[in-house]
Amino acid sequence: MNLNKNLPTGTRDKLFREARAAYKIEQQVNHYFEKRGFKRIETPVIEFEDVFSSEHQADAKLYRFFDEKGRLTVLRPDMTLPIGRVVSTTGVMLPLKLSYSGKIFRANEDFGGEQNEQTQAGIEIIGYPSIKAEIECILIGIGVLNALEIPNFQIELGHAAIYRRVTNLLNLSETAEIDFRLLIQNKSLTGIKRFVADNPSTLDDFILALPRLFGPATAILKQAKNLTTDKGILTALREMETIVEAVSYTADISVDLGLVQDFHYYTGIIFRGYADLAADNFLSGGRYDHLLEQFTSASSPAVGLALNLDSLTTLQNRAGVIKKQVSTSLLIHYDLDAIQQAEKLMQETPNSELSFFETPTNAISFAKKWHIPAVIHVSRQGIQTIFQREADL
């Protein structure tokens, strides 16, 4: 089968207006990070599989292939672990505020509608144990969405320690933990009831309520505190309250106490961003204080934020905030011995471009096809208008 006209599953081309919008968004987001004092970092698209082979990435769907020496390599499925590798192996001084943007690749199932190639931008705050690091990530996420004019968005908070505390207390097998995770993610009331009946504990009331513990932050957190006396869970709830109090002046904040991230490396506050015009989250992040341990014996506190720039481009398009690309208003056809005059004229005339055609006739045909309103001919004898759209006469 000849596939020279096909694209791999989950990939797509971007043309003209969309490609320009995606480029502009990436520029705008990176500029925002820089203004907040973040230092840019770039890592290779190709990494050795060992970077992603820890338990933290057990669910990652990797594009694997062998290099010229027979070593197993992958296309990076996220940016966080490669940045952890850099920080752990280069001896850079902590604490650090890093930013990035680039492509990530995940081998999703066919017909799932997910893009296997995504453009992602984000930040990593490494070496700061303070909750101010989480607050900074969330404020930056909100600031970026406002700068991009994303309408009606909402930030949702969770806490990885809640799910971890429940599963640790229940002492679940690996299979049982996977089943429980799916029940929580699907908010299955019936399934959770059966699970609690089969796995009774001091957290029964809290677990039974988990599928319903999402919504307005203040009300849900107050309700949750009345359902348990467990110190670990109460500590997590108080951290969430602190975050809500700090950032709620900037955006609509909700909570989901059953929020479980796909990557297992999160240890504390986790967050996502949603909007009325988007089916899935386009912003995610949280705290992961043990991530660097797989590269070095020393651990370091870290918080990260990631933005799906492809989703944000789509959101901007749906919201009608993508500005139209400025159209060419003048095509400059020239004789080769008049290139200097033509180039000078093009530099001085906004929204103009040079014609590469050999004849004025071809230049005029091109202008009509692409709705360019005027064509001039530059020669040693001077400048002559050879085409003017009737509406502009």
Swiss-Prot record:
Main location as per UniProt: cytoplasm
GO CC field: cytoplasm
GO terms, biological process: histidyl-tRNA aminoacylation; L-histidine biosynthetic process
Entry keyword Cytoplasm: yes
Disulfide pairings: none
Cell compartments where the protein resides: Cytoplasm
One Pfam family cited in the UniProt record for this chain: tRNA-synt_His
Classification via Gene3D superfamilies: Bira Bifunctional Protein, Domain 2
Pathway(s) where this gene product acts: Amino-acid biosynthesis; L-histidine biosynthesis; L-histidine from 5-phospho-alpha-D-ribose 1-diphosphate: step 1/9
GO molecular function, one term: catalytic activity, acting on a protein
Keywords: Amino-acid biosynthesis, Cytoplasm, Histidine biosynthesis
NCBIfam families in the record: hisZ_biosyn_reg, PRK12292.1-3
Remaining remarks: This function is generally fulfilled by the C-terminal part of HisG, which is missing in some bacteria such as this one.
Family: Belongs to the class-II aminoacyl-tRNA synthetase family. HisZ subfamily.
Quaternary assembly: Heteromultimer composed of HisG and HisZ subunits.
Function: Required for the first step of histidine biosynthesis. May allow the feedback regulation of ATP phosphoribosyltransferase activity by histidine.
Protein name (Swiss-Prot/TrEMBL): ATP phosphoribosyltransferase regulatory subunit
